[in-house]
């Protein structure tokens, strides 16, 4: 009577569960309708989001968030996580990267310093604060064309002013837990890595070049 090795049995078990899990996922996807976005990365592509955005933020104003907006919002929130307990801090992002970042004694100064880093790239960018946005700061923000403004809270008058731009997306961020692992599709499979939770401190920096 033929027998199979432990290695072979593990292989067949893996294949069997792979098939059954795809069936279960197909049922889940049918009932868990995805949010259709305006378009994907480019206007000729379709795009969807599968998840619960309401756990992350409340949208207070503006048009529907786009595929690219969501990528930038994710990058902004992940960046600011390291500075939740810091002095007033402001960041400006474009294409998933920070083009301006600053911490100061008050939020207006933090915003202006972040903007000064690269005012050209800031145009049409994503703005995020680690504290409530006040009227003074909102008045400065309102002179810049930006896609999204994110903060844990907004002063009432500041919010009214920021809403004066019809399409500007205003998001009130919630205190949300994010998984320690990040997944992304790759070669018909999934890559998984631990989230980068290490914060570099300026005192550990070493000067390698002198101009």
Predicted feature locations:
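Internal, active-site/partner-interface "lid" segment
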Residues: 1-30
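ATP-dependent carboxylate/acyl-activation modules
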Residues: 19-211
